[in-house]
Amino acid sequence: VGDVQSGFSVGQRVSVSPSRPCGGCKYCHEGLPNHCLNMRFYGSAMPFPHIQGAFREILVIESSQAHLLAPSTTLAEGALAEPLSVGLHAIQRAGGVFGKRVLVTGCGPIGNLLIGSLQAAGALQIVAADLSDSALACARRMGASETHNLKDEPEALARYTADKGYFDVMFEASGSAQALRDGLTCMRPRGVVVTVGLGGDVSIPLNLVVGKEIDLRGTFRFHPEFAQAVELLNRKVIDVNPVISHTVPVHQAVQAFELAGDKQQAMKVVLDFGVKDV
């Protein structure tokens, strides 16, 4: 712990934000730190040379990156502050979800943590769609009121298309262009669609976007939401434990990474470094 900082002491447990904006560029000054021109986000391949990751035994960080964990918050829960922050920023981009009907397509770790955040934010109804029964089971534990396996029932979302659509807000978290296209048919006029998981070029029915005045928005990373995520974890507002499918000792790290790559078995795999929670 450096001499020039205050508020932290040796032995305290913290969750570390990977977001490191410069604070001096035009976007930082405009309150858009996630779009910082000099961002040093851990593990980012966007700039060249690439930014180093943080998977190491010893890591020197800025004090602003450290967020204290409450005694009741486990290290495993603290490790999920980062993906939880992604969903919190997506909700901010949607402009609010209180009292609204929400569709979430894609129930991986990001999608399911997003569902937990939606429930905490007061969404009236949360409908989740995925191709995996285990992912949808996790979605129900995180707060989804209805789930649909589109592999078993490809036309399941058709029931929401009557009278120009049903949902006020949609979060597309699967990265599937087809999920985005199908979701647009379910949106009410002037609904908001936030693309969380899409990348690359896709084709969409622009006639639906125009004809129903749908607001299509992107979401990228986070910054202030990390502190909010840790606060929500510390206050037990959101239980992230259903997303932790496996805990593996660090000496079995290779097997843990292989397990994490098997989406049929794993959701979030936590490495146990043998450090006891308070």
Question: What residues fall within each predicted segment?
Answer:
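Short glycine-centered segments of the SAM/dcSAM-binding site in methyltransferase folds
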Residues: 13, 101, 191-192, 215
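Hydrophobic/small residue at the entry helix of a nucleotide-binding pocket
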Residues: 86, 110, 118
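NAD(P)H dinucleotide-binding glycine-rich loop of Rossmann-like/cofactor-binding domains
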Residues: 24-105
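Rossmann-fold NAD(P)-binding glycine/threonine-rich loop
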Residues: 197-213, 228-231
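C-terminal hydrophobic helical "lid"/dimerization subdomain
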Residues: 181-184, 223, 227-278
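Adenosine-nucleotide cofactor-binding segment
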Residues: 104-107, 117-182
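Helix-to-beta-strand junctions that scaffold the AdoMet/dcAdoMet cofactor pocket
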Residues: 187-189
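Glycine-rich beta-strand-centered segment in the early N-terminal region that forms part
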Residues: 1-26, 70-72
